[in-house]
């Protein structure tokens, strides 16, 4: 099962921490939104403690601040502090701080308390390059579905840790959450172990390609605008404080139109610190990065030589189905030659097959057509595009990736 929690919160937090212009010092900036019908009964106390946890020397307190306030309506309380020579977060050096925020009533009773990770880092696009902490990065990424060979979409924390460790051991430094926001613990683990994350809104409309108006039927229909914003908003509000998330993706293969333009504006208004990307908008103003899929090497070469102002990152390439991924060296010879080409995400990480037993009692990996559904349409083995099998044993072409 997947955990689902509905919580009526009296306090929400917004961590906007980053680096100053020197890229050496941290700028801690925490907004605490308070709202409750009971907040007008005396002064409430909000405390914020920021700790740097060391492996050998224990925790060190960086911030310990308390604010007392009487709340008569929704209000935002700010905690700010400059931190000299801050430990910066990146995929290579995932330094984290621990934040504890507590709301107490006038009598000292704790009403709500949060603990979360804080990573100090900046994300910029300047001179046509995507930079983290002032340095251009190269994305050696994979697309990943949430998948378990026994439980399907219900994945455990232990399996997430295993996925991350496999990626890190094989020189993978980034993951695209295809094609929906993942469980919250996934981002916390990416913060901890060090993976760059592209978080993706659950907006997809493959089936509309069969409509006589195609994708534009929905993407330009204003009656669907609210649904577009809602899915982007839910992604952003839940995951906005995760330092591993360096980009927002508006969705996958859902065409393009006014609804995506509006979602782009909403996300940029709420968060100017991260790029927003979307594959069909790669050549338009509502994608900050060219984010194409399955473009050949000639396309990359032409783009790199055109002096474009946008960096290019392949959102999908090197489709890892069957005997495949043999052209990685050709791709990376070009990527390594041109700064404007900043990598890509292989499709995809793991086969989405499921363990099944045949009539002889032998276990096998089942896919479309193996579930007494031969009379129904299915995609056969098109769910088996992984660098690893469903049980995470490496497929032969995975060895090409580590090189």
Task: Locate each region found by the language model.
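Exposed aromatic-hydrophobic patches
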Residues: 73-84
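Short glycine/proline/serine/threonine-rich loop/turn segments at secondary-structure transition edges
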Residues: 39-42, 82-96
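Internal, hydrophobic beta-strand segments that form the core of beta-sheet-rich folds
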Residues: 93-105
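Beta-strand-rich binding/interaction modules
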Residues: 26-68, 77, 99
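Beta-sandwich strand segments
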Residues: 57-60, 107-114
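Single conserved hydrophobic/aromatic residue that forms the stacking wall/gate
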Residues: 1-8, 12-13
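Extended substrate-binding grooves/exosites of carbohydrate-active enzymes
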Residues: 9, 110-403
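Short, solvent-exposed loop/linker segments at the N-terminal edge
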Residues: 19-26
């Amino acid at each position: 099962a997947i955990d689902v929690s509905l919580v009526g919160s009296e306090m929400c937090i917004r961590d906007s921490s980053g680096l100053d212009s020197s890229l050496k010092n941290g700028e801690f900036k925490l907004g605490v939104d308070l709202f409750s019908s009971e907040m007008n009964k005396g002064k409430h106390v909000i405390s914020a403690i920021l700790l740097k946890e060391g492996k050998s020397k224990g925790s060190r307190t960086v911030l310990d601040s308390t604010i007392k306030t009487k709340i008569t309506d929704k209000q935002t309380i700010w905690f700010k502090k400059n931190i000299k020579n801050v430990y910066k977060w990146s995929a290579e050096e995932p330094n984290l701080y621990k934040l504890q925020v507590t709301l107490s009533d006038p009598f000292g009773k704790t009403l709500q308390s949060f603990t979360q990770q804080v990573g100090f880092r900046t994300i910029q696009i300047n001179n046509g390059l995507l930079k983290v902490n002032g340095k251009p990065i190269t994305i050696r990424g994979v697309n990943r579905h949430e998948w378990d060979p026994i439980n399907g979409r219900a994945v455990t924390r232990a399996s997430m840790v295993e996925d991350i460790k496999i990626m890190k051991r094989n020189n993978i430094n980034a993951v695209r959450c295809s094609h929906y926001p993942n469980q919250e613990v996934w981002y916390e683990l990416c913060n901890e172990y060090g993976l760059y994350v592209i978080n993706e809104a659950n907006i997809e409309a493959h089936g509309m390609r069969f409509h006589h108006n195609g994708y534009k039927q929905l993407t330009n229909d204003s009656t669907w605008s609210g649904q577009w914003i809602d899915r982007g908003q839910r992604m952003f509000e839940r995951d906005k404080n995760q330092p591993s998330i360096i980009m927002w993706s508006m969705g996958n293969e859902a065409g393009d139109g006014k609804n995506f333009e509006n979602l782009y504006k909403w996300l940029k208004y709420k968060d100017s610190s991260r790029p927003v990307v979307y594959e069909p908008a790669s050549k338009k103003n509502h994608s900050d990065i060219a984010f194409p899929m399955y473009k050949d090497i000639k396309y990359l070469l032409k783009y790199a030589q055109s002096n474009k102002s946008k960096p290019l990152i392949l959102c999908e390439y090197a489709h890892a189905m069957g005997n495949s991924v043999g052209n990685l060296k050709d791709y990376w010879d070009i990527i390594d030659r041109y700064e404007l080409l900043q990598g890509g995400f292989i499709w995809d990480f793991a086969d989405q097959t499921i363990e099944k037993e045949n009539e002889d009692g032998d276990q096998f990996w089942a896919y479309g057509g193996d579930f007494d559904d031969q009379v129904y349409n299915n995609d056969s083995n098109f769910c088996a595009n992984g660098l690893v099998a469903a049980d995470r044993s490496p497929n032969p072409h995975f060895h090409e990736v580590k090189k």
